[in-house]
């Protein structure tokens, strides 16, 4: 791409429209007197290219570029340059279709700057992209050498010369970005220090302080809760003591008064007894001789009656047992019959299914035969109407069928001719192409072999990846799962601690009493070792266990002793050693009696309502084995007070019935059940253990997956590289001429095969159509006979179809009857099976009834036997009484003496009780006053009075010793006052905020550190590439530098070398040789020689990265004529592919140019004249002889 013409209008000294045409594609020169406007042409080119530093075009702002700053009536400056774009290799991106590109830039005073490309408005960026794509970046212009550039190069130090090489090699931009990146790293480093300082000096101490304050706050809350709990407990205890004193004093007062009355009654009773005894003694004396044994006879009669009743009940009992055995035998027979019927029923169902399937098959066959009959009837009707059947079964006339055959023959012949022509053409083309493609291109073969090798390597990599058995994204999913598990574990721990904080009694912790302590020896609290089968029984089970729920189960008494002595237990615990505990359990006989009494579903042993490990059997029997649990109060009362049971019983609602004299009940506390909370705690603990095990397993899996993941990533990266390489090779093969020829050959071969197949098919179609036509033609000749034959065939087919349809219909109806019969049999079997079930249920009910009756009768038989035994004993006793009557009379005298002595004792006791009655009256009055005062001071006593002293309640005085609670309360009040002075109530919320800020800063810190690591790695990698590119650039520039300098100064040589003791990367300096003598520095050279050195370096760098256009502005100003002449020759010889526009005042320079432009300043405006020069530098005669050169030679305005 090169400049063809420039149009200037209102630009600097070019007031009028000035066209500068006919630029030479290679060497152009501009000359003229100072101030004539020759440099303004260069300024116009820079202006159009979009220069941003206006000082380089000798202007301070865009208004300075307008002719006389717009004060001469011209308010617009416009520059338009036409570029030759016929060489498409150097064409800008996107402009390959244009042979010429015209770019215009306009600036209007007080208006805006405007660009046009080929007459169309364009923005600054698009113009910059256009010129930058061909190496014409005017804001970094290596193609532009202005006045003073040579002096600047001569004064450069080694690092500055190196920077020019870097600029030429394109690595300078990297250095700028590297410095920017290093500054970014320094900023990030400062940010890291800031984050670290904030973490160390602010957040971490704050978090530590807040954690301590949180601990204090939690301790303060714990103390407050305990004070509240213990205060109520202690006050409740004091209230109970006062109330107990009041009640006890009143009860004891009443009891003593009753005792006085009782003693007085006993005195009176004893007097009566003494009189009665005296009377009995008299009677006994009288009856001693009269009694002859009448009582004995009555007792013997009673014995006989008891024996008769016993025999009768025993007979009835034996009869019921026989009936039960009979029913059980009947049940076995029914069960046997049911099993046999089930087998028969299953066999019959299979048979029904089989016959039903056969019926379906017959129905399908019957339907098909019916359809065939309809088709035969239709065919008969068509033949009767004079129609005939074609090959498709459709009815048509013979003439119509013959016409269709003719069409088929004609179509087949046409297709055959087309296929023959296509085949002939393809065969000829194939022959020609095969002659052209005789051997495979060696480059194609190499690429094909390379592609195969890459594919094999890909397959090998895929096999290795598959062998690793690694799933992509598995590591990320595992990491996400680990984060989720960590969050779940944290949540569960918080829930666990919250439950323990809410219910401190659930916490059981101890210190190992000795080294290598086996924690399996301590089983834990009873409440933690059980699971309640039915949650509705929790209240009852809590009352059954009472304070034993908090007992600690251990394996041996030795373990318990060590735990108590050195376990540092936080509170008092009762120990249950499994090897020593003496457990009792309700006998199975007692349980059966209770179940018979109220029903088996209404009473249970408490032990049966909980689940536990077998090794804890003794401990659980100790806690739950001696109490019944009933569903309601009525059943509980029956069970507890039955003389055969007499066992403590608890209802599901919480009422307790104790046959030894205790009955408790009423409203229960609405607080959460301890066992329910224990179960909730266990569930949380189990889930926490599962999550921790999962996390541990996940950590192990991640550790094992790390190496595999890394190896997989490496193999995947190699595989992707090979895939890209294979795609490139495949594309290259497909774009090669050999591949295209092969594709054409394959297409021709395919065409030949298709044509041959078409020919074969058309011949077959034509043959069949001709044969059919011949048959139809014969039919037409014998139409009447043919019609008769077809009519007979149709009648025959119709009769055959009708016979077949009737037969299949008959078979289907027979099969339907068979199915209906066997279905009825199946239904009968099902009814019999149902009947057996009902009979079996009735037998089971009878057996159950007999068993219940036998159980009752067994009890009655036992009772009758006991009556017989008692009657026998009475008879025996009576016989003994008669023998011992003398002894009784003596005993009566002794009893009279005893009663008299008791009267004396009672009189003494009455005097003592009178004294105590006075004392208890005073105590009862004091207790009543204290109770009244406490009820007035504490409103909550009335609401919670029913819970005072109740087991498993907040006022359980057995579990919590009130005296110890009072002492503990005093200490807690002191702790509360101490903690209250320093506690921070906002510590919890502030700590959460501080921890979030800490985590956020740590995340930012990790991001910054990762960014820094990546940047440093990239810089290190790019530094190596930069050094390689710099060495290549230095060698190329150095070679051209020496060559150009030798051309400019024959017999001399020059090079760029690093300073002594340094490398190329440290800097470069000039080394010049005149003849065979190398100069130490440039000061030994003349001014002109130094200028040539600098110019040679500039031009050698232009050669390293050639641009389509070069602009030189009086670079020969400091040179003499001989050197100037050499520069011109050098440009002609070294730069044969670029356009040069040179401004010079010396003939030695512009005489070498192919086209010369001369500027003049006429009437305040600049003009331009064009001259074509011969190779010897002389102006053509034609151009000299005319004032105005012909068109194409020069233009003057």
Curated annotation (Swiss-Prot):
Belongs to the SMC family. SMC2 subfamily. Pfam families: SMC_hinge (PF06470), SMC_N (PF02463). It is found in: Nucleus; Cytoplasm; Chromosome. Central component of the condensin complex, a complex required for conversion of interphase chromatin into mitotic-like condense chromosomes. The condensin complex probably introduces positive supercoils into relaxed DNA in the presence of type I topoisomerases and converts nicked DNA into positive knotted forms in the presence of type II topoisomerases. Forms a heterodimer with SMC4. Component of the condensin complex, which contains the SMC2 and SMC4 heterodimer, and three non SMC subunits that probably regulate the complex: BRRN1/CAPH, CNAP1/CAPD2 and CAPG. Interacts with BRD4 (isoform B), leading to insulate chromatin from DNA damage response pathway. GO terms for biological process: cell division; kinetochore organization; meiotic chromosome condensation; meiotic chromosome segregation; mitotic chromosome condensation; positive regulation of chromosome condensation; positive regulation of chromosome segregation; positive regulation of chromosome separation. This is Structural maintenance of chromosomes protein 2. The keyword ATP-binding applies. ATP binds at residues 32-39. GO terms for cellular component: chromatin; condensed chromosome; condensed nuclear chromosome; condensin complex; cytoplasm; cytosol; extracellular exosome; nuclear chromosome. Keywords: Acetylation, ATP-binding, Cell cycle, Cell division, Chromosome, Coiled coil, Cytoplasm, DNA condensation, Mitosis, Nucleotide-binding, Nucleus. It comes from the Eukaryota. PANTHER family: STRUCTURAL MAINTENANCE OF CHROMOSOMES PROTEIN 3. Residues 173-507, 672-926, 963-1031 form a coiled coil. Residues 522-640 form the SMC hinge domain. GO terms for molecular function: ATP binding; ATP hydrolysis activity; chromatin binding; single-stranded DNA binding. The modification N6-acetyllysine is found at residues 114, 222, 677, 1158, 1160. The SMC hinge domain, which separates the large intramolecular coiled coil regions, allows the heterodimerization with SMC4, forming a V-shaped heterodimer.
């Amino acid at each position: 791409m090169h400049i063809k013409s420039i149009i200037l209008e209102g630009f600097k000294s070019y007031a009028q429209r000035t066209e500068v045409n006919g630029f030479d594609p290679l060497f152009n020169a501009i000359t003229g007197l100072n101030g004539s406007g020759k440099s303004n042409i260069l300024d116009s080119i820079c202006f159009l290219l979009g220069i941003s530093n206006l000082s380089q075009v000798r202007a301070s702002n865009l208004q300075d570029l307008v002719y006389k700053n717009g004060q001469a009536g011209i308010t617009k400056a416009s520059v338009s340059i036409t570029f030759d774009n016929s060489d498409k290799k150097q064409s800008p991106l996107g402009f390959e279709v244009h042979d010429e590109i015209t770019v215009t830039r306009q600036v209007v005073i007080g208006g805006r700057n405007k660009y046009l490309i080929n007459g169309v408005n364009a923005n600054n960026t698009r113009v910059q992209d256009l010129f930058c794509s061909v190496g014409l970046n005017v804001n970094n212009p290596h193609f532009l050498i202005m006045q003073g550039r040579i002096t600047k190069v001569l004064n450069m130090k080694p690092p500055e010369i190196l920077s020019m090489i870097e600029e030429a090699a394109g690595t300078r931009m990297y250095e700028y970005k590297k410095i920017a990146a290093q500054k970014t790293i320094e900023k990030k480093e400062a940010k890291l220090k800031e984050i670290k300082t904030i973490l160390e000096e602010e957040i971490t101490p704050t978090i530590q302080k807040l954690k301590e304050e949180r601990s204090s706050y939690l301790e303060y809350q714990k103390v407050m809760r305990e004070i509240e709990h213990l205060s109520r407990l202690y006050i409740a205890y004091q209230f109970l003591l006062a109330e107990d004193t009041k009640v006890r004093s009143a009860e004891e007062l009443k009891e003593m008064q009753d005792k006085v009355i009782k003693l007085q009654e006993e005195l009176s009773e004893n007097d009566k007894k003494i009189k009665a005894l005296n009377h009995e003694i008299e009677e006994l004396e009288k009856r001693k001789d009269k009694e002859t044994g009448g009582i004995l006879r009555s007792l013997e009669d009673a014995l006989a009656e008891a024996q008769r009743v016993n025999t009768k009940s025993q007979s009835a009992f034996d009869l019921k047992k026989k009936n039960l055995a009979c029913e059980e035998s009947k049940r076995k027979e029914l069960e046997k019959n049911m099993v046999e019927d089930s087998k028969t029923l299953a066999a019959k169902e299979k048979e029904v299914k089989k016959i039903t399937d056969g019926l379906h098959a017959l129905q399908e066959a019957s339907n098909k035969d019916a359809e065939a009959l309809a088709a035969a009837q239709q065919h008969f009707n068509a033949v009767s109407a004079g129609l005939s059947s074609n090959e498709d079964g459709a009815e048509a006339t013979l003439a119509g069928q013959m016409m269709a055959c003719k069409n088929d023959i004609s179509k087949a012949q046409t297709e055959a001719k087309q296929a023959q022509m296509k085949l002939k053409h393809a065969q000829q083309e194939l022959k020609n192409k095969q002659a052209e493609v005789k051997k495979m291109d060696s480059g194609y073969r190499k690429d094909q072999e390379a592609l195969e090798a890459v594919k094999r390597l890909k397959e090998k990599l895929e096999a290795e990846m598959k062998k690793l058995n690694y799933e992509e994204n598995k590591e990320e999913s595992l990491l996400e799962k680990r984060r989720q598990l960590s969050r779940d574990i944290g949540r569960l721990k918080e829930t666990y601690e919250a439950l323990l904080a809410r219910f401190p009694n659930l916490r059981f912790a101890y210190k190992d009493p000795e080294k290598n302590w086996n924690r399996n020896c301590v089983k834990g609290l009873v409440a933690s070792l059980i699971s309640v089968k039915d949650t509705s029984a929790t209240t009852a089970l809590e009352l059954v266990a009472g304070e034993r729920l908090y007992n600690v189960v251990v394996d041996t008494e030795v373990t318990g002793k060590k735990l108590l002595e050195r376990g540092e237990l936080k509170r008092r615990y009762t120990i249950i050693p499994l090897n020593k505990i003496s457990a009792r359990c309700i006998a199975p006989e007692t349980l059966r009696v209770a179940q018979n009494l109220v029903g088996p579903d209404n009473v249970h042993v408490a032990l049966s309502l909980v689940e536990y490990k077998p090794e804890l059997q003794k401990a659980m029997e100790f806690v739950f084995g001696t109490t019944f649990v009933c569903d309601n109060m009525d059943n509980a009362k029956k069970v507890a007070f039955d003389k055969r049971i007499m066992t403590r019983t608890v209802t599901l609602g919480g009422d307790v019935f104790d046959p030894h004299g205790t009955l408790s009940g009423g409203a229960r506390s609405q607080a959460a059940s301890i066992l329910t909370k224990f179960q909730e705690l266990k569930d949380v603990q189990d889930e926490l253990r599962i999550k921790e095990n999962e996390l541990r397993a996940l950590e192990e899996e991640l550790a094992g997956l790390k190496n595999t993941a890394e190896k997989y990533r490496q193999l995947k990266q190699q595989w992707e590289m090979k895939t890209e390489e294979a795609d490139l090779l495949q594309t290259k093969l497909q774009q090669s001429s050999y591949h295209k020829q092969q594709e054409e050959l394959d297409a021709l071969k395919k065409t030949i095969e298709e044509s041959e197949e078409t020919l074969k098919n058309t011949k077959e179609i034509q043959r069949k159509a001709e044969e059919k036509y011949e048959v139809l033609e014969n039919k037409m000749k014998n139409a009447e006979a043919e019609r008769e034959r077809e009519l007979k065939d149709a009648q025959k087919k119709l009769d055959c179809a009708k016979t077949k349809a009737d037969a299949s219909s008959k078979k289907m109806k027979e099969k339907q009857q068979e199915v209906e019969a066997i279905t009825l049999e199946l239904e009968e079997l099902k009814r019999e099976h149902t009947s057996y079930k009902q009979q079996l249920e009735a037998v089971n009910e009878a057996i159950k009834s007999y068993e219940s009756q036998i159980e009752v009768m067994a009890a009655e038989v036992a009772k009758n036997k006991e009556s017989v035994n008692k009657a026998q004993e009475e008879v025996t006793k009576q016989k003994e009484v008669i023998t011992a009557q003398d002894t009784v009379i003596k005993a009566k005298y002794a009893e009279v003496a005893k009663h008299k002595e008791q009267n004396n004792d009672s009189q003494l006791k009455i005097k003592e009780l009178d004294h105590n009655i006075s004392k208890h009256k005073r105590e009862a009055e004091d207790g009543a006053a204290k109770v009244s005062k406490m009820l007035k001071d504490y409103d909550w006593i009335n609401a919670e009075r029913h819970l005072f002293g109740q087991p498993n309640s907040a006022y359980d005085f057995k579990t919590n010793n009130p005296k110890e609670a009072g002492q503990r309360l005093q200490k807690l009040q002191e702790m509360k006052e101490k903690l209250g002075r320093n506690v921070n109530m906002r510590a919890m919320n502030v700590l959460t905020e501080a921890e979030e800020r800490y985590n956020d800063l740590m995340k930012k810190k990790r991001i910054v550190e990762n960014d820094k690591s990546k940047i440093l790695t990239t810089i290190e990698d790019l530094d190596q590439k930069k050094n390689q590119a710099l060495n290549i650039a230095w060698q190329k520039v150095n070679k051209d530098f020496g060559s150009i300098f030798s051309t400019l100064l024959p017999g001399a040589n020059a090079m760029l070398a690093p300073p002594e003791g340094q490398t190329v990367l440290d800097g470069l300096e000039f080394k010049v040789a005149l003849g065979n003598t190398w100069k130490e520095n440039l000061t030994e050279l003349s001014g002109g020689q130094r200028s040539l050195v600098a110019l040679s370096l500039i031009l050698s760098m232009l050669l390293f990265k050639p641009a389509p256009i070069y602009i030189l502005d009086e670079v020969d100003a400091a040179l003499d004529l001989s050197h100037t002449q050499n520069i011109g020759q050098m440009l002609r010889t070294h730069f044969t592919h670029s356009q040069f526009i040179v401004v010079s005042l010396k003939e030695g320079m512009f005489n070498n140019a192919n086209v010369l432009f001369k500027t003049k300043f006429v009437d305040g405006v600049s003009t331009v004249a064009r001259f074509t020069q011969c190779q010897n530098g002389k102006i053509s005669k034609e151009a000299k002889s005319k004032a105005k050169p012909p068109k194409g030679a020069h233009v003057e305005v």
